[in-house]
Every structure is written in structure tokens, then in C-alpha cells.
Amino acid sequence: MIGKSDVLTLRSGRKVLSSKAVEAPIPDDWGYFRNGTIHIIQSSHQDIAWMDTPEYCRTERIEDIIIPALDIMREDPNFTFEMEQTLNLMEFLEAHPERRDEVIERYKEGRFVWGATYNQPYEGLASGEQLVRQAYYGRKWIRENLPGCDDRTANNVDVPGRTMQMPQILAKSGIRNLFVSRMREGLYDWYSPDGSSVLTYTPGNYGWATLMWKFFEKDAVTAFERLHPRSRLWSDYFRSRHIPPHYAVLMSCDATKPVNFAPVIDEWNRIAELAEVELPRLKCSTAEEYLALVDTPEAQMEEVVGERPDLWLYIHGPAHYQQTVAKREAGVLLPAAELFTAVNNVCLDGSWDYPRAAFDRAWMASIYPDHGLGGKNGEITDRIFGDSLSVARDLGRSLLDASLRKIADRVPEQAGNWVVFNDLQWDRPPTAVSCPCSASSATAANAWPSWPRACLRSDMPPTG
């Protein structure tokens, strides 16, 4: 049952009656992984919508994915599962607050994790501060709202594009790992220009093991047979880079339901224990658990520096122009609103309540649309996404206006003068501000109404 390929020969005396090539059902040569572990990382890839409307997909992932996964964990203490974004956690707790303690317990056990970012965005479509807010409403939200819980692995498995500063943002947010896809399988240290990096893992394509290879759909013997070529393919890669012999298999695809592979895992490990040759073990793991095992001081990961331009060009421009404009406007207005709200609070000696709830709503609205614009019933999804971005922009504008008016009211200027603000963190060069007025031509007989007048102010200090 376990061994190498051979030729079976049937003889009668010296006469060969039959000869046939025979392959052992379970190969015995597992190379670098012979004493290692194969980790099943099971998740369900989730766009906010795409498969259908946001409301349909929200209900499906709560009732048909998250709840069944939690129920399996009640019966099997070795089962693990993960979602890819904190937004899914927020949705679930809103729908089922009675299971909050259970969610916290599974999180602490490391059996059900949710991802360290709010969702999975087009990184290149967001402003820098909008990318930072992915960690605010991801890892930071988890730490503030689920006592004793934390997450250090960000997911963005669908979009084939990485932004230059994203590793820097993640690293400085305490997020050590990045789980991506749609690039060559392997383990990487992905660097930003400032020298910060995150450990990055890609399985190749997030859905291949589920859709094509189907390692675990039958029994352990079939799993041994189908996984053996992976050990031959990756032994030299792991050995040469001194990466511990842990190999990951991602079982995921769009909206896939949880599957308990315990029968295959148990049978596999019984065979490995009884075998007279060294065979790898099989277990359920989360991405964070797996990456902690391979991230050793001796490991020499491939290094990647800089950006990977997004290949899905159709989504960034004409197809969703209005949404893109609103998102970019919100990305400018909201940081300025936060800045001058804080300045105003200082001017008032802290007596003005900081409108955190309004800012939270605005920021989450500005990053709510993920990478799943369009799709089935896409006209509904796009309208919802567009409304969300418009809310973010309009809230940003109103919050900024409120703070600027309060500050301007305290400036001792004569009536009719203009107060000009600089929201940048560096000196601003002479700035032109156009304001409506009436002007006359050289001849008094001709009047040009509402001609813009340029008001110039030089040496504008930062944040002033």
C-alpha cells in the first residue's frame, strides 16, 4: 500500500506470463516534508456582494456559512475556520448578539478568526488614510470590542494588485501577515519603500484547491495520492530557504460552505502513525497559525519591494466614475475634518465633545465598497455603494465646515476679510482663493458681474 512504483512480474518457471507496472496507492517519498505537516486552511471568500445583492450575501454568509462553522466547532474541537474581514464579524454580532461570548471564546482559542482589516479593498483606489482606516475598523475594532481578542493577518485574496505603502501601513498597525492570491505561490517578505515589511503568503489562486485539485473530497488514500506531487514540487523551495516543513492548502472559493474534513484527517494520521516510512501529518489550521510556524529567524523568504499595479483596470475608471469621485473627495475631506475638529477642541480647552460616532460612520462609509462592484444584480449593489460613498463625502464636508466656522469665529479679523486654512503638514506656497465679486472693465460703461477675484496668502504654516 505504501511504497514506490514497481513492475509486477508473473512467472511460470523461467517463462514470464505477465508483467505490469504497479504504483503504490500511497507514495513513500515525501522529500523535505516527510516529517512535516500539511495544514488545511479553510475559509469562504466573501465579496460584500457580487454573488448577489449585499443583503442576500450578508444573510447567506451569516446563516449558511458562519453559523454552520460555529456549530461544527461545538462538536469537533480540532475544526478551524476563518472569514476574511472584520465587517463580516460586525454583521454577525449585529444579527446574533446572543452568540457574542461564543465568538470571543473561539477567537481566543484561535479556531475561528476574522481578519485584521475592515474588508478587502482596491488598495490603489483608496487614499492613504482610507487604507489606514482598514486597520482602524479591523484589528483596532477587534481589540476594543472583543476583550482578549486580536488579529494579525490581513486578507485580500481576490484583487490582483498591491499598493506600495500597504505593507508599511499593516506593519505599523501591528499586523504581521498578509494573505493574498492571484500571484505565484510562495512565501514572501513584502517591503514598502521605508523598509517595513509583512510576511506575505499566496496559494496561487484562492479557489484552485476547492475547484480543481479537490484533495480531500474522497478519502485519505486519495488525499495522499493527490498531495504527493505538491511535496515534490515544493521540497527544494522550502529546503533551500530554510523554511520549516509546513505546507498549506487553502480550501476556499466564493461563498463556499464549511466542510469538516475530520474523517480524511483522522484516517491520514492513522496511516502515518502505522507506516514504517516517514509521512507528513495532516491538520486543520488558520492562516495565522500556519504563518507563525514558518516565520522563523532562519527562514529566508523571497523579497518583494514596491507595488503590483491592479490588473482589473475596468473597475477604476469610467465604469464607476461617480463612485470613484465621491470616494476620493471623502478621502480628502475626512482627514481635514478630523484635523480641524481637533484644533477647535484645543482652542476650546477640550470643552467641545469630539464627534467620534459621526467620524466612525463617515470613515466606514468611505471604505465600505470593497472590490465587488457590479456582479449579479449589480445595479442594486452599485447604487448602495454609491450612496455609501456620497454619505461619506457629505458627512466629511459638514464636519469640516462645522469645525472651520467655529475656529474662524475666534479669529479677530475685520468684517469682510477671509480666513484661509491649511490642512497639510507642511508649509503651503502662495495660494489663490477665488471668490465671487463684481468688477468693471477699463471703461466704466462696461460692467462684468461675478468676476472672480484672486486672494493671495503666502507663508501659510502647516496645520494652520
Q: What is each model feature region?
A:
Residues F421-S438:
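Surface-exposed beta-strand/loop patches in extracellular or lumenal glycoproteins
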Residues I2-D423, T443, P449-C455, D459-T463:
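Catalytic-domain carbohydrate-binding cleft regions of carbohydrate-active enzymes
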Residues C435-A447:
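Solvent-exposed beta-hairpin/edge-strand motifs
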